[in-house]
Amino acid sequence: TPSFTVNDEKEFYHCFATSEHGNIFDFVMKTQNFKFGEAVKHLAQLAGMQPYMFSKQDEEREKKWKEYLSIYSQYVDFYHSELLKNESYSNARDYLKNRSLGKEEVKKFKMGFIEKNPSFFEKLKNEFSEQTLVESGLFYLDEKKNTYVERFRGRLIFPINNISGQPIALGGRIIEKLDYLAKYINSPETNFFKKGSNLYNLDLARKLSN
């Protein structure tokens, strides 16, 4: 239908009518009512390949990977929108403007800004476990205050994407001169993000090379 589109470059589909989206494995799982391992086997058979036998550990890792991507996608989308539209974030926009970075650059690199006292953890914890959110590297537990803190609060954020254009980590920069805070920070390494294996803007470089 006209509302259904497939992005060959990023290897995902999206239906604007139902908001359903995902990769080829998601599509087969939804349309055939398969589990992940069954979808892989089915596609391998269609391609004339010997399928890999997925274990329960493989399926659990795939589930964790999807949760990880969803957390980062929601996080980046929310704070990108806030930077573009929230009137109280004019200081962040002015900071970028003084460095010749306007709305076009903000959209191109999907920059965002996080206020000093954010509360996005409360929104995400309705969908994900506290352990999963901490494992993403975006949050940590302040044991003295017994509360979860957003690692990039008070910073401009720059998504670090995988080669498919999906955010898997962040770079952050403070916009105020505070000697007790590091000017730049990056996401810590996680089970799904290894600093030596990902380059900033690698997905954009791939587009330019095609």
Please annotate each region the language model reported.
Residues 24, 35, 39, 92, ...:
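Helical mechanochemical/support elements of P-loop NTPase systems and associated helical scaffolds
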Residues 1-33, 41, 54, 67:
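N-terminal single-stranded DNA-binding subdomain of primase/primase-helicase replication proteins
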